[in-house]
């Protein structure tokens, strides 16, 4: 009987091996411009929409850290007058806050997991200082700038990702950039942001770092950020309000970059790849492009100089481009002569 053995009845040991997940670095950029959020509060009719976003963001960061013990996070705020690294701090090498906080000012539960508490305390404390500085400037009557610093914060986030990736050469580290911004019915893309955002797109594509975007409020889509997500295999999500924001973050923004080619992403069906003229601000489908800084223009600038990088254009090329189209004359049909009888 022992000789009769069928391979189908033999019990084979499973060769399942546990594969450790690759650590991930999540760099979060939050647009904290008070002017944008104040306009959004008036449209919604509720105050404190920025605080609701920050609460959902902290939960999202804790969820990312809980996936793997080696996961890392970085938080950058795009303020009205620059950018601010919320976490990790400049004087913190290991990513944990060493500043002593009084018990009265501590709003984070001390019984929380240490990894979560270090991040939450640093983010809340630095945001509190940013808000204090913004309110002090308003009380002093300092005029608020109208330009956004979102593109600068994105550049700083990619710089941090590049540095951390080179510091951990022995460990493979996946990285991605998440941008949370706000929009209103009157808000639109600023023309001067096109070139910095295009530079961010080129850098992220070279580093194979996807850019994810969550836009809260607003009627119009952010054309430049849509182009960034499409070029880097990222996700673009437009949320009407802050209700259920943590659900959007924990579903659409937790899709692993390696699985995004098989998963239906919540992106828009069509992306507007047109750009804006640097001088007039009009949407341009066909225009003039500077060969140095890739500045797009709908008209030839005065002085034959690029308004962005101040490069001089070749006079022969400008004369050729300024030449109006010539319509060749059509051949006239010969009139038939009347034959008189």
Swiss-Prot record:
Keywords assigned by UniProt, alphabetized: DNA damage, DNA repair, Metal-binding, Nucleus, Transcription, Transcription regulation, Zinc, Zinc-finger
Subcellular localization is given as: Nucleus
Q: Name one Pfam family in it.
A: Tfb4
The biological processes this protein is annotated with in GO are:
nucleotide-excision repair; regulation of DNA-templated transcription; transcription initiation at RNA polymerase II promoter
**Binding partners and assembly:** Component of the 7-subunit TFIIH core complex composed of XPB/SSL2, XPD/RAD3, SSL1, TFB1, TFB2, TFB4 and TFB5, which is active in NER. The core complex associates with the 3-subunit CTD-kinase module TFIIK composed of CCL1, KIN28 and TFB3 to form the 10-subunit holoenzyme (holo-TFIIH) active in transcription.
* Keyword Phosphoprotein found: no
User: Which GO cellular component terms are attached?
Assistant: nucleotide-excision repair factor 3 complex; transcription factor TFIIH core complex; transcription factor TFIIH holo complex
Q: What is this protein called?
A: General transcription and DNA repair factor IIH subunit TFB4
Keyword Zinc assigned to the entry: answer is yes
Q: Where exactly are the zinc fingers annotated as C4-type?
A: 290-309
Q: Which family does it belong to?
A: Belongs to the TFB4 family.
Q: What does this protein do?
A: Component of the general transcription and DNA repair factor IIH (TFIIH) core complex, which is involved in general and transcription-coupled nucleotide excision repair (NER) of damaged DNA and, when complexed to TFIIK, in RNA transcription by RNA polymerase II. In NER, TFIIH acts by opening DNA around the lesion to allow the excision of the damaged oligonucleotide and its replacement by a new DNA fragment. In transcription, TFIIH has an essential role in transcription initiation.
Molecular-function annotations in GO: zinc ion binding
Which species does this protein come from? Eremothecium gossypii (strain ATCC 10895 / CBS 109.51 / FGSC 9923 / NRRL Y-1056) (Yeast)
């Amino acid at each position: 009987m022992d000789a009769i053995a069928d391979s189908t009845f033999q019990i084979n040991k499973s060769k399942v091996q546990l594969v450790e997940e690759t650590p991930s670095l999540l760099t979060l950029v939050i647009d904290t411009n008070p002017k944008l959020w104040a306009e959004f509060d008036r449209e919604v009719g509720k105050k404190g929409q920025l605080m609701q976003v920050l609460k959902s963001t902290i939960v999202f960061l804790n969820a990312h850290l809980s996936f793997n013990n080696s996961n890392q996070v970085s938080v950058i705020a795009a303020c009205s007058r620059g950018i601010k690294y919320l976490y990790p701090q400049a004087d913190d090498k290991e990513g944990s806050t060493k500043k002593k906080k009084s018990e009265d000012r501590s709003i984070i539960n001390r019984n929380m997991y240490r990894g979560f508490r270090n991040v939450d305390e640093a983010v809340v404390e630095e945001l509190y200082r940013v808000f204090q500085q913004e309110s002090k400037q308003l009380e002093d009557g300092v005029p608020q700038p109208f330009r956004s610093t979102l593109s600068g914060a994105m550049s700083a986030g990619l710089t941090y990702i590049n540095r951390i990736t080179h510091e951990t050469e022995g460990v493979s580290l996946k990285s991605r950039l998440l941008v949370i911004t706000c929009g209103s019915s009157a808000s639109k893309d600023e023309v001067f942001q096109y070139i910095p955002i295009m530079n961010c797109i080129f850098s992220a594509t070279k580093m194979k770092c996807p850019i994810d975007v969550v836009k809260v409020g607003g009627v119009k889509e952010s054309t430049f950020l849509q182009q960034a997500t499409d070029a880097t295999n990222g996700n673009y999500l437009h949320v009407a309000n802050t209700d259920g924001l943590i659900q959007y973050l924990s579903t659409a923004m937790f899709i692993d970059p390696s699985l995004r080619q098989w998963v239906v992403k919540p992106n828009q069906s069509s992306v507007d790849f047109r750009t804006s003229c640097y001088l007039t601000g009009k949407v341009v489908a066909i225009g003039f492009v500077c060969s140095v800084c890739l500045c797009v223009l709908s008209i030839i600038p005065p002085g034959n100089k690029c308004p962005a990088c101040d490069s001089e254009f070749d006079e022969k090329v400008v004369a050729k481009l300024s030449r109006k189209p010539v319509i060749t004359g059509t051949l006239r049909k010969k009139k038939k002569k009347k034959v008189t009888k």
